[in-house]
Every structure is written in structure tokens, then in C-alpha cells.
């Protein structure tokens, strides 16, 4: 198994982090926006971190476990991005692009998890 940085879903997860970093720097300095910023940044960085950690476990049950955690973090990231949209903290276009990349990552993680589970069974 090559380097985790070669995985397309890892690369896209890093694109999310870069986009989220730029996004949160532009959010208002209100208590609500700052709390959402912290949660969003934490969940978005967790996606790639769990992909990387799981990749070191190779193809066993532990790898699947970490990919499932990454998927949960991607779901949480989706929640926070949609919350920002719902309460109108940022421009829809900026958020929508991140949601689309995040949705790609979620689909890729689901497909990879299903493939690994099928190989195991």
C-alpha cells in the first residue's frame, strides 16, 4: 500500500482543510461564529488525520475502523458547513464548494469501506 498522501480521498480531505481555514478566518468575531469555527476546523482536520492513521494499519479491521471515524468527521463537517449556511455567516458560494468536495470524500470513504468489508468477508 503506497503512501497515504497518494490516496485521492486524503488529497480531497486536505483541500477541505485548506478551504475551511480560509473560511473561518473570514467569519465574524461573534461568540457563535467562533465556536462554529473551532468545531468546523476540528472536524475537518480529523478527516485526513484518521485516513492517515488508518492507512498505517493496512487493510485490516483497524483500517476500516479509522475510515469509519473519518466518515463520521466528514459528516460532522457537513453539519457545520450547513449550519453556517443556515444562519448566513458566510457567502453561499464559498460554503457550497466545500460541501461538494466533502460530499465527494464521503462517497469515496463509503465505497472504500464497503470494498474493504467485502474483501474481509
Regions found by a protein language model. Give the residues of each.
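Amphipathic alpha-helical assembly/interaction segments
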Residues: 1-121
Amino acid at each position: 500500500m503506497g503512501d497515504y498522501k497518494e490516496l485521492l480521498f486524503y488529497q480531497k480531505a486536505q483541500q477541505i482543510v485548506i478551504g475551511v481555514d480560509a473560511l473561518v478566518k473570514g467569519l465574524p468575531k461573534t461568540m457563535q461564529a467562533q465556536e462554529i469555527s473551532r468545531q468546523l476546523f476540528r472536524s475537518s482536520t480529523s478527516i485526513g488525520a484518521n485516513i492517515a492513521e488508518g492507512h498505517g494499519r493496512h487493510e485490516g479491521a483497524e483500517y476500516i475502523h479509522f475510515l469509519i471515524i473519518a466518515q463520521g468527521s466528514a459528516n460532522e463537517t457537513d453539519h457545520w458547513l450547513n449550519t453556517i449556511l443556515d444562519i448566513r455567516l458566510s457567502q453561499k458560494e464559498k460554503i457550497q464548494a466545500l460541501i461538494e468536495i466533502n460530499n465527494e470524500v464521503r462517497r469515496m470513504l463509503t465505497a472504500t469501506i464497503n470494498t474493504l468489508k467485502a474483501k474481509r468477508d
